């Protein structure tokens, strides 16, 4: 059986990892062994943080809605409850956007929610 030399495959694999580690600090971008570990860890962080991003944005939207609702004399939970009672189906992302950029419209929503309570 013929001998298989794997230099080409190894070189390609190393190049792939070092390309992914481009921009990393020090040995992490130059030494294959260290770069491989850094790339694996980066992938784990990316996977985790894609899920956390959704939670963090929802937290941000809720904090903004709560702050705006309290300026209009209503807590977040009562505001959301009031909106559900008058069947206003606007998600938290849009509510937060309205709270930041259109205070008059948000105040109208708060009044609508107050009327249902």
UniProtKB/Swiss-Prot annotation:
Gene Ontology BP term (one): translation
Alphabetical list of SUPFAM superfamilies matching this protein: Ribosomal protein L20
GO cellular-component term (any): ribosome
Gene3D superfamilies assigned to the protein according to its UniProt record, in alphabetical order: 6.10.160.10, Ribosomal protein L20
Domain of life where this protein originates: Bacteria
Gene Ontology MF term list: rRNA binding; structural constituent of ribosome
Pfam families given in the database record: Ribosomal_L20
Matching InterPro entries: Ribosomal_bL20 (IPR005813), RIBOSOMAL_L20_CS (IPR049946), Ribosomal_protein_bL20_C (IPR035566)
Key words of the record: Ribonucleoprotein, Ribosomal protein, RNA-binding, rRNA-binding
Function field: Binds directly to 23S ribosomal RNA and is necessary for the in vitro assembly process of the 50S ribosomal subunit. It is not involved in the protein synthesizing functions of that subunit.
NCBIfam families linked: rplT_bact
Recorded family membership: Belongs to the bacterial ribosomal protein bL20 family.
Stated name of the protein: Large ribosomal subunit protein bL20
Organism: Actinobacillus pleuropneumoniae serotype 7 (strain AP76)
């Amino acid at each position: 059986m013929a001998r298989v030399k794997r230099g080409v495959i190894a070189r390609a694999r190393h190049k792939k990892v070092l390309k992914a580690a481009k921009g990393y600090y020090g040995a992490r971008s130059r030494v294959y062994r260290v770069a491989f570990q850094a790339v694996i860890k980066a992938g784990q962080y990316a996977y985790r943080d894609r899920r956390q991003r959704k939670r963090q944005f929802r937290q941000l939207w809720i904090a903004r809605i709560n702050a705006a609702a309290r300026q209009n004399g209503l807590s977040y939970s009562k505001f959301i409850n009031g909106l559900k009672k008058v069947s206003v189906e606007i998600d938290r992302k849009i509510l937060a956007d309205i709270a930041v950029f259109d205070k008059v419209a948000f105040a109208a929503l708060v009044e609508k929610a107050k009327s249902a309570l």
